[in-house]
């Protein structure tokens, strides 16, 4: 069961309509998350598994569970590669 949590530290969060801006002070980079990635990011609390987040995503966005799980795993991988998530 894969669980990740948002990195603690210098990441400022700002809303931009349905998107979310993550301002990473360590890398001096700004990352813009669309509504799907935002939904996933906000649930990365170290308690919910990728599968649980995918179930919530499928319900919220009315998509098939397998599609939601693929999106969650892909998004988690990208966020982890950007050092915005750490192991839960």
Locations of regions flagged by a protein language model:
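Long, low-complexity, charged/polar intrinsically disordered regions in eukaryotic proteins
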Residues: 1-25
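Long, charge-rich, low-complexity alpha-helical segments
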Residues: 16, 26-88
């Amino acid at each position: 069961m894969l669980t990740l949590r948002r990195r603690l530290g210098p990441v400022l969060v700002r809303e931009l309509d349905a998107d979310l801006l993550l301002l990473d002070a360590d890398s001096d980079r700004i990352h813009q998350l669309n509504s799907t990635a935002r939904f996933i990011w906000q649930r990365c609390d170290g308690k919910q598994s990728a599968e649980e987040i995918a179930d919530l995503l499928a319900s919220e966005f009315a998509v098939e569970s397998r599609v939601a799980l693929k999106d969650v795993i892909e998004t988690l991988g990208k966020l982890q590669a950007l050092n915005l998530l750490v192991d839960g």
